[in-house]
Curated annotation (Swiss-Prot):
Lineage: Bacteria, Pseudomonadati, Spirochaetota, Spirochaetia, Spirochaetales
Signal peptide boundaries: 1-23
Keywords: Signal
Protein name: Uncharacterized protein TP_0789
Pfam families: LolA_like
Length: 258
């Protein structure tokens, strides 16, 4: 069975064929079980549009390591435009699900920790918040999940799963996920705030098998109230990379010998 990955900026998910043979909890548990691709590197183009107009295009590279202990480490570095080139972001997920995040801005020449309310701020002017960078992995950690029927999406029959979070700090307390029944591909997610208002919609498409991993090459995150979208186009993907451990440290963010 091919693994299924949600690569850009989020955790890898998938491996969920034969949906009706599993409970919703079993399905969600598969998110983390199949996420362990070891290491991977990607290069992507992010296009931000507001009210139908393109306002920015960002190019970035990302390195991720999935530890057997359950820890996840991600480094993102921006390559263009010139105004953000050299900006680096480090995200470290601990075994207990807690996150540490750090941002390095070349103009300030310092590393700052992302804490508290900063986690819900826009990440580099995109529709992703710092919290959203771990959106899919966070969904897998929600407190409660139930099967919510089936529905056709994109011409394919999907299992719909509802997930709930009872954590007081949660930004999204409810989510609906669409997973193709035949392929196990995660193709759509809707995320709701504490007032049960639908806040964001995520879609994943253009799946391609890369080194045996079923990988979506296009991911779109829409912020409904702002009428804005951020589209991630993967241009390069490599799994099982040899990435030095020092890459995933706050100290490495300031290094220039790349």
């Amino acid at each position: 069975m091919k693994r299924i990955a949600y690569v850009p900026l989020c955790a890898v998910v998938g491996g969920m064929c034969s949906m009706w043979a599993q409970s919703a909890t079993d399905v969600m548990g598969s998110f983390k079980k199949t996420a362990e691709t070891g290491t991977m590197g990607t290069q992507a183009r992010m296009v931000v549009r507001k009210a139908g107009k393109t306002v920015s295009t960002l190019v970035l590279k990302q390195y991720t390591r999935y530890e057997k202990s359950g820890e996840q480490k991600t480094l993102i570095e921006f390559l263009s435009p010139l105004s953000v080139r050299g900006t680096r972001f480090l995200s470290l997920q601990k075994k207990d699900g807690a996150w540490e995040q750090y941002l390095y801005l070349p103009k300030l020449a310092r590393v700052r920790s992302i804490t508290g309310g900063d986690a819900h701020a826009s990440f580099m002017g995109t529709d992703f918040s710092y919290h959203d960078l771990s959106l899919v992995g966070g969904v897998a950690d929600l407190d409660e999940c139930t099967l919510d029927g089936t529905e056709s999406y994109g011409g394919k029959m999907c299992v719909r799963i509802q997930t709930l979070s009872h954590k007081p700090q949660a930004r999204y307390v409810r989510a609906l996920l669409w997973i193709e029944q035949e392929t196990g591909r995660f193709v759509k997610g809707e995320f709701f705030d504490k007032k049960d208002k639908r806040v964001k919609i995520m879609t994943l498409s253009d799946y391609e098998t890369i080194q045996g991993v079923d990988t979506p090459k296009t991911v779109v995150l829409e912020t409904i109230a702002q009428r804005s979208t951020t589209t991630i186009h993967l241009t390069k993907v490599e799994y099982h990379m040899d990435i030095p451990e020092k890459v995933f440290t706050p100290e490495y963010l300031t290094q220039t010998d790349r």
